Amino acid sequence: MPKYRSATTTHGRNMAGARALWRATGMTDADFGKPIIAVVNSFTQFVPGHVHLRDLGKLVAEQIEAAGGVAKEFNTIAVDDGIAMGHGGMLYSLPSRELIADSVEYMVNAHCADAMVCISNCDKITPGMLMASLRLNIPVIFVSGGPMEAGKTKLSDQIIKLDLVDAMIQGADPKVSDSQSDQVERSACPTCGSCSGMFTANSMNCLTEALGLSQPGNGSLLATHSDRKQLFLNAGKRIVELTKRYYEQNDESALPRNIASKAAFENAMTLDIAMGGSTNTVLHLLAAAQEAEIDFTMSDIDKLSRKVPQLCKVAPSTQKYHMEDVHRAGGVIGILGELDRAGLLNRDVKNVLGLTLPQTLEQYDVMLTQDDAVKNMFRAGPAGIRTTQAFSQDCRWDTLDDDRANGCIRSLEYAYSKDGGLAVLYGNFAENGCIVKTAGVDDSILKFIGPAKVYESQDDAVEAILGGKVVAGDVVVIRYEGPKGGPGMQEMLYPTSFLKSMGLGKACALITDGRFSGGTSGLSIGHVSPEAASGGSIGLIEDGDLIAIDIPNRGIQLQVSDAELAARREAQEARGDKAWTPKNRERQVSFALRAYASLATSADKGAVRDKSKLGG
């Protein structure tokens, strides 16, 4: 039977110094036999998804201590991708994921904590904490800050829903007046919480439910709603139960690697495809699987993408629905219920509540449950009041959205499309694959062919788009923006948003070895692997080359002969030390980012560190 890890620092005469320091934090003799549980918070005033988390760590800690544990809170960093977008700050976003994972490992192992409650929310924070949890493999529960309410404003005598992407598009559209742009900007992000669409943050928080590491409602219950408080209270109580089950009863089912099994990863990816989640989730699930030592690869994702339909459509793929609407329709469990009825899920999985998938659906699926309290929870709705306070309102929808033919969540029979919301494409310059969010691609451009316009930085591409140098029919190629080449694998939300603002959203394609924001829609193909900086063939594309995209058949092809590509590769290699680097890009890259780049793998490996370079 495993002993408490914390006993290393609390027992034995030779640990008198450690105990003296623990006493200085408020611990007493009575605490030294209890489990020490880390409350891993991520409060910051920089990020609306985290601005309300300051007091929530204390809330969890109080429940831990009431249940017989000792709570010790610390914070991780948290980068706001939206604020970092469109300038050099975006180079730091993806690398922050590794820093978060490492910092959690450092704190938890340095102080021998027994378990964790991870309070996350936004883009790289949930993945970073997830990677750390599976690396450490000690009991853990995730509880996120929750989604932002959708913005609303009146334009042309109509009330419309808004989010961050609308503000970006209208701000760049020369046809939009200053007053309208200002109105949209002021209305787009009304409350605390993660941005209101199915962007990366909300996608990842939904996936923690499917992985079994968070409670039902975690991905969709609004940050502002009073019902969300119960998730934090429950997490504090439940983590003590899980911790004692593992350390005192030798019950390994309480460990995250046994909850987030390969079957659970397959369920999470199935959910992601069905709900049209952010393409960034592919990166993060691949990275998390490696930490869990699970053989889960792009090949698995490709297989799932070919059989899973799209059952949910949310902003940015439509402006009709945001996360508050997903919640009203039953949230993540509502989507999982439809997938289960379609025979598309692994049922032999459990969650942190100890429930199997069938038990979870019976209790929490709004189409099955007889529990009025559960139905009431899924009626939790927005208040439409600007606030930075968690749990500040208790508004409810009059009814649930249980219309599986025309509502937000659909049954298999009434799916938005038989193909899911994400697809893996392969071709002669994406030998290891690339990713497209098909949920955001108009049917008219599922097959597309056009001449390449090649740029070696996001900045140059933006300048060309706004300067009118990109025209209908073009395929914009942005390279040397991968994990190693950027470094940092920038998101390309500004180029895709500006294509929309220039009226080219359905008339152009964009291909990159970088990545896209969860707010991206359109024919936007990212994660091209291998990346240019690793000798990938995307580095051989020249202006005017024809590129053919065939999403239905999962293909992407540079229409250049093998002989010509071989000649171009030979010429590239002849550049010596400058081979596979941008020819005309000036970019200041810090030592910290160079250190990240030196170990980074391409996107098909999750952009994690190359362990072979570290002897791993």
UniProtKB/Swiss-Prot annotation:
N6-carboxylysine sites (modified residues): 124
- Read off the PROSITE patterns from this record: ILVD_EDD_1 (PS00886), ILVD_EDD_2 (PS00887)
Provide a GO biological process annotation. isoleucine biosynthetic process
Annotated binding of Mg(2+), by residue: 81, 123-124, 491
Coiled-coil spans in chain: none
InterPro entries registered for this protein in UniProt: Dihydro-acid_dehy_C (IPR042096), DihydroxyA_deHydtase (IPR004404), DiOHA_6PGluconate_deHydtase_CS (IPR020558), ILV_EDD_C (IPR056740), ILV_EDD_N (IPR000581), IlvD/EDD_N (IPR037237)
Cofactor notes: Binds 1 [2Fe-2S] cluster per subunit. This cluster acts as a Lewis acid cofactor.
Q: What does this protein do?
A: Functions in the biosynthesis of branched-chain amino acids. Catalyzes the dehydration of (2R,3R)-2,3-dihydroxy-3-methylpentanoate (2,3-dihydroxy-3-methylvalerate) into 2-oxo-3-methylpentanoate (2-oxo-3-methylvalerate) and of (2R)-2,3-dihydroxy-3-methylbutanoate (2,3-dihydroxyisovalerate) into 2-oxo-3-methylbutanoate (2-oxoisovalerate), the penultimate precursor to L-isoleucine and L-valine, respectively.
Quaternary data: Homodimer.
Protein's UniProt name: Dihydroxy-acid dehydratase
| Species for this entry | Shigella dysenteriae serotype 1 (strain Sd197)
| Gene name tied to this protein | ilvD
